[in-house]
Curated annotation (Swiss-Prot):
Protein name: Poly [ADP-ribose] polymerase tankyrase
PANTHER family hit by this protein: ANKYRIN REPEAT DOMAIN-CONTAINING PROTEIN 39 (PTHR24171:SF9), ANKYRIN REPEAT DOMAIN-CONTAINING PROTEIN 39-RELATED (PTHR24171)
Annotated segments matching region Disordered: 807-834, 864-886
Species, as recorded: Drosophila melanogaster (Fruit fly)
One cellular component term from this protein's GO annotations in UniProt: cytoplasm
């Protein structure tokens, strides 16, 4: 718009040009300059809205706002200044302060009621003004107070079209977007409120997942931020790059309150992302239990499938959560069916498990929702629910029972169903009101409640009785209730203890009144039949006749037993009821309970002397009346044989039901006279045995042959059962009629673990049976014999061992200082680094090899290694005399060393990091990489050079305390031998390469000899101890070991304290004679997660490392199945797990002390793809 068409010179009038005699000039000047004292002095009700007639007809507020005088603006507003006053151009005070960027004044005016969308004569809004003048803060304030950014001025321009470069991002929603997103993520409410507008509330991040502020706030549980965003129009349906809505984020991280806020704001609980994951998938897979419950209560469907055809139930990681989700889903489906009164759907859903499902947030049960349904099928639905066991008196969160709701809504059919089923007629809600209070205005409802003994005298918390709320016609009814005896019978039926108490105490004779219009039942008949326990107890205590029979000859005990009311039955029997009383048809209470399948009642009656053989008029015993489906009742009536059968079959539930103090030690009279514990022990039914022992079973009971339960467990090798029996003080040396102890049984049957257990708990290995045989004479298995031999060691063998030890000590040779160096090393290298002693060791394949003792010796100041020798010792493959070698005589610092290696460009870096020669001597590849030497070639060159320098000068050398790794050349005999052992011990494993990868050969990259004096001396000492304890035989072998903690082992040795008790043979250190088996553990148990770089268990790129170790096995305990141990068995130094059907495929060697093994070689290798193997390579799997 051209300036000629509209003058935008706001406040351009020079007040100095106004006539000197203008009486308002001083006021306008004071407002302009912000002189608050002068303004207060000059302002009056007449001048507060005065006009500048010499200018644009502005008011004092125009001037103060335009010049940003906040105090003056505030005073003028408090003094009655018009906030909507217009000057001659239609400008309001808000236009002025917006145009000049006075953000504080803008907020003050908006707070005082100024319209953010007011327009001037050219249809300019304050936002047009602020946008065109580049006033960012003002634009933010206006948008935050509802400014409409789509309004067009008289030239059809929006604020965005007029926006300055600075304000354009505000109007596009891009202004400081990253800060806004970060504020939402971090929960910075003040910063968020300062930046938030309707235009950026749903902005998406420019990178990453393209999340909105609501995504971030929901994911990081910023409840306050979420509330602010939702209040400002945040879209709960916005999706990020992966199709996730904010509800996905909140549910995934288990943020319950945020989830609730989003759902209340209209979030779709079944929203799908790009992979068809719903919020419930996220919550279930992360075990967010409370969030799952919330989603299900709002209609989430756990049966929806994601792209992997998995439902939310499938995604739950635990069985408990899967069952809970399925249970709650069924419960909410039933609640929905009841809410809609869908009887056919409810029939399909209802079952005893969910009929009393409670809505987690309203407390409503299916019966509550059925009662309030307006549908005509309400009664049919309620009857269905009550038949299935719906609780009649459950209260919801408002403390209302179903009867309160039915009375409130005057649903007579619902009231009748509830009352007939025994709902509490005088239940109180949170206001102390009964159902009678709720329907006091309606005569039919009141009459119905009074027929069930509703109490008209109950006063609510508001001090009102039902009569005070009743209409005139109802009031008469309430003042003349039915007679007291009828009332008593109805109260006993309904379980109204207060009414029963009041009537009986006022008229004690009425306690045995009769229902003359019915079956001549007494109040006790009704109370017993309807399971009114407190009423039964009260009536019995006040003279009710327990023998009173109705006109069919039924006593109250018949009623209680027929309907399965256990507590009532117990009370009646306790008060003298005859358990064998008969009605007119000769039915006893046991007949009634058996015919109705009431197991607990039958058990109670039998306990108190009920006769299971008594016949009714048709000649039927209680057992004859049992239904085919009631197996438990039939078993109970069978007697001890059922308990013995349950113990034998391991049916714990049956055992629990059938056991009584009288039957727990019953006998199998038709068999070996066994007890239930004999059978449970012999058939390895641990849970049954444990239950029997905890409930008083005789642990030392003998059967017909004199066997106790421990004999059975030992004979059949049931280790856990035997341990349980020993825990319960069984006699471990008990004998049967033939003098056999449990140890005889276990030894004869080759039960190694049981023999060990029995011996550990005092079993006597010398006891003889009637034929004079000890357990060892009956033993068939070698390992059992070894175990018993150890336990029966004589004093003679101890003396022989002592003599052998002395002989070994006196005859041990002194180290030969002139022995040959290790094969493959030069004599000068050997003399400088290795002890000259050599030993013969047994390799994994069974071959033997002569090795030098791997102990580094301190270097003398005169010791020197030639460059060629140094290169060889450090594994400088392919080195030559042309390689750069540091001159030890001229190198005194790092700069000189780097110069000798032609690495001048690294001098500044090393000086900045203050790296000395001593420090450099201790550094490795990773350390150099961290300080900035990223090129592998440079690092290799440095490490090679420093190794040579250390060899010739001793710089940084501490071989006595630290581990030294000596590289072996590929043509070295030791290198060749190790490689041959690696390749020759590859085997095919049962997991088909899942743990260690699929391969048929290795690529051996490097073999390093481990030298550590401290570790070697510790190993040598332990090896000597083992030899002395094992007839001078340490049984040393070379075995493989794979572990993700190779470096720690090389530096500090093996440590049994870190062994895992969950291993097959307990908390030991495991070795293998096959390299492929150890390869399975290089990245952890079962291959862990694979190599660090590619997370691939079968990675053919990344180098791996394992150890070839010396292991002093000593005397090994042979084991064929898993057994958890914390140390080697007594008299043994190791455990050897032997292959067996259903057990190990290849042998394992386990020691339980770290000093029993020494890491001899560190092997770096790669597994090779089978396709990459040369055609001539032999398949050694």
């Amino acid at each position: 718009m051209a300036n000629s068409s509209r003058s935008r010179a706001i406040l351009s009038v020079n007040l100095d040009a106004v006539m000197a005699n203008d009486p308002l000039r001083e006021l306008f000047e004071a407002c302009k300059t912000g002189e608050i004292a002068k303004v207060k002095k000059l302002i009056t009700p007449q001048t507060v809205n005065a006009r500048d007639t010499a200018g644009r007809k502005s008011t004092p507020l125009h001037f103060a706002a335009g010049y940003g005088r906040r105090e003056v603006v505030e005073f003028l507003l408090n003094s009655g200044a018009s906030i909507q006053a217009c000057d001659e151009g239609g400008l309001h005070p808000l236009h002025n302060c917006c145009s000049f960027g006075h953000a504080e004044v803008v907020r003050l005016l908006l707070k005082a009621g100024a319209s953010p969308n007011t327009t001037d004569n050219w249809n300019y809004t304050p936002l047009h003004e602020a946008a065109s003048k580049g006033k960012v803060d003002v634009c933010l304030a206006l948008l935050q107070h509802g400014a409409n950014h789509t309004i067009r001025n008289s030239e059809q321009k929006t604020p965005l079209e007029l926006a300055d470069e600075a304000t354009r991002p505000v109007l596009t929603g891009e202004y400081r977007k990253d800060e806004l997103l970060e504020a939402a993520r971090s929960g910075a409410e003040d910063r968020l409120l300062a930046l938030l507008t309707p235009l950026n509330v749903n902005c998406h991040a420019s990178d990453g997942r393209r999340s909105t502020p609501l995504h971030l706030a929901a994911g990081y549980n910023r409840i306050g931020i979420v509330e602010i965003l939702l209040a400002n129009g945040a879209d709960v349906h916005a999706k990020d790059k992966g199709g996730l809505v904010p509800l996905h984020n909140a549910c995934s991280y288990g943020h319950f309150d945020v989830t609730k806020l989003l759902i209340q704001a209209g979030a779709n609980v079944n929203a799908n992302d790009l992979w068809a994951f719903t919020p419930l998938h996220e919550a279930a897979s992360k075990s967010r239990v409370e969030v799952c419950s919330l989603l299900l209560s709002r209609g989430a469907d756990p049966t929806l499938l994601n792209c992997h055809s998995k439902s939310a139930i499938d995604a739950a990681p635990t069985r408990e959560l899967r069952e809970r989700i399925a249970f709650e889903y069924k419960g909410h489906c039933l609640l929905d069916a009841c809410r809609k009164c869908d009887v056919s759907r409810a029939k399909k859903l209802v079952c005893a498990e969910i009929v009393n499902f409670v809505h987690p947030y309203t407390g409503d049960t299916p019966l509550h929702l059925a009662v309030v349904s307006p549908d005509g099928k309400r009664k049919q639905l309620m009857e269905l629910l009550t038949r299935k066991g719906s609780l009649l008196n459950e209260k919801n969160k408002a403390f209302l029972t179903p009867l309160h709701l039915a009375a409130e809504l005057l649903h007579y059919d619902a009231m009748e169903v509830l009352l007939k089923q025994g709902a509490k007629v005088n239940a109180l809600d949170s206001l102390g009101q009964t159902p009678l209070h709720r329907c006091a205005r309606d005569e039919q409802a009141v009459r119905l409640l009074l027929s069930y003994a509703a109490d008209t005298n109950i006063v609510s918390l508001e001090g009102l009785t039902a009569a005070q709320l009743a209409s005139d016609s109802v009031l008469k009814l309430l003042k003349n209730p039915p007679d007291s005896e009828t009332h008593l019978l109805e109260a006993a039926k309904a379980g109204d203890l207060d009414t029963v108490r009041r009537i009986v105490l006022n008229n004690p004779i009425s306690v045995n009144c009769r229902d003359l219009d019915g079956r001549h039942s007494t109040p006790l008949h009704f109370a017993a039949g309807f399971n009114r326990v407190p009423v039964v107890q009260f009536l019995l205590e006040h003279g009710a006749e327990v023998y009173a029979a109705d006109k069919g000859g039924l006593v109250p005990l018949h009623n209680a037993c027929s309907y399965g009311h256990y507590e009532v039955t117990e009370l009646l029997v306790k008060h003298g009821a005859n358990v064998n009383v008969s009605d007119l048809w000769k039915f006893t209470p046991l007949h009634e309970a058996a015919a109705k399948g009431k197991y607990d009642i039958c058990k109670l009656l039998l306990k108190h002397g009920a006769d299971p053989m008594k016949k009714n008029r048709d000649g039927a015993t209680p057992a004859d009346l049992v239904k085919e489906s009631d197996h438990d009742v039939a078993e109970l009536l069978r007697g001890p044989s059922a308990l013995l059968d349950a113990a034998k079959k391991g049916n714990l539930a049956r055992v629990q039901r059938l056991v009584t103090p009288e039957s727990i030690n019953c006998r199998d009279a038709q068999g070996r006279n066994s007890t239930p514990l004999h059978l449970a022990a012999g058939y390895n039914n641990f849970e049954c045995a444990e239950y029997l022992l905890e409930n008083g079973a005789d642990v030392n009971a003998q059967d017909k042959g004199g066997l106790i339960p421990l004999h059975n467990a030992s004979s059949y090798g049931h280790l856990d059962i035997a341990a349980l029996l020993i825990k319960h003080k069984t006699v471990v040396n008990a004998t049967d009629k033939w003098g056999f102890t449990p140890l005889h049984e276990a030894a004869q049957k080759g039960r190694t673990q049981l023999c060990s257990l029995l011996l550990a708990h005092g079993a006597d290995a010398y006891m003889k049976n009637q034929e004079g045989q000890t357990p060892i004479e009956l033993a068939t298995a070698d390992d059992v014999k070894c175990l018993l031999q150890d336990a029966m060691a004589t004093s003679l063998s101890q003396q022989a061992l002592s003599a052998s030890t002395q002989s070994l000590t006196s005859s041990s040779p002194a180290p030969d200082a002139t022995a040959a160096a290790a094969p493959g090393t030069s004599s000068s290298s050997s003399s400088a680094i290795l002890s000259p002693t050599t030993e013969t060791v047994l390799l994994p394949t069974g071959a033997s090899m002569i090795l030098s003792v791997p102990v580094p010796l301190p270097l003398s100041s005169s010791t020197r290694i030639s460059p060629a020798q140094g290169a060889e010792a450090n594994g400088a493959e392919g080195s030559s005399s042309d390689d750069l070698l540091p001159d030890a005589d001229t190198i005194t610092n790092v700069s000189g060393f780097l110069s000798s290696q032609q690495l001048h460009h690294l001098i500044e870096l090393f000086e900045r990091e203050q790296i000395t020669l001593d420090i450099l001597a201790e550094m490795g590849h990773d350390d150099l990489k961290q300080v900035g030497v990223s090129a592998y070639g440079f690092r290799h060159k440095i490490l090679k050079g420093i190794a040579q320098l250390r060899s010739t000068t001793g710089i940084g050398n501490n071989v006595n305390l630290c581990t030294l790794l000596v590289d072996l050349l590929p043509d070295d005999k030791e290198f060749v031998a190790v490689e041959e052992e690696m390749q020759a011990t590859i085997r095919e494993h049962r997991d088909n390469g899942q743990a260690g990868g699929y391969f048929t050969r290795y690529n051996i990259i490097r073999v390093q000899k481990v030298q550590n004096r401290k570790l070697w001396e510790r190993y040598a000492h332990r090896r000597q101890e083992i030899a002395e304890e094992n007839f001078l035989q340490s049984n040393e072998r070379m075995l493989f070991h794979g572990s993700p903690f190779i470096n720690a082992i090389v530096q500090r040795g093996f440590d049994e304290r870190h062994a895992y008790i969950g291993g097959m043979f307990g908390a030991g250190i495991y070795f293998a004679e096959h390299s492929s088996k150890s390869n399975q553990y290089v990245y952890g148990i079962g291959g862990g997660i694979g190599c660090p770089s590619h997370k691939d268990k079968s990675c053919y790129v990344c180098p791996r490392q394992l150890l070839l170790c010396r292991v002093a096995l000593g005397k090994s305990f042979l084991q064929y199945s898993a057994m958890k141990m914390a140390h080697a068995p007594p008299g043994h130094h190791s455990v050897v797990g032997r292959p067996s059907a259903g057990g190990l495929h290849f042998a394992e060697y386990v020691v339980y002390r770290g000093e029993q093994s020494y890491p001899e070689y560190l092997i770096t290798y790669q597994i090779v793809k089978p396709d990459d193997s040369s055609s001539g390579t032999e398949d050694t799997r």
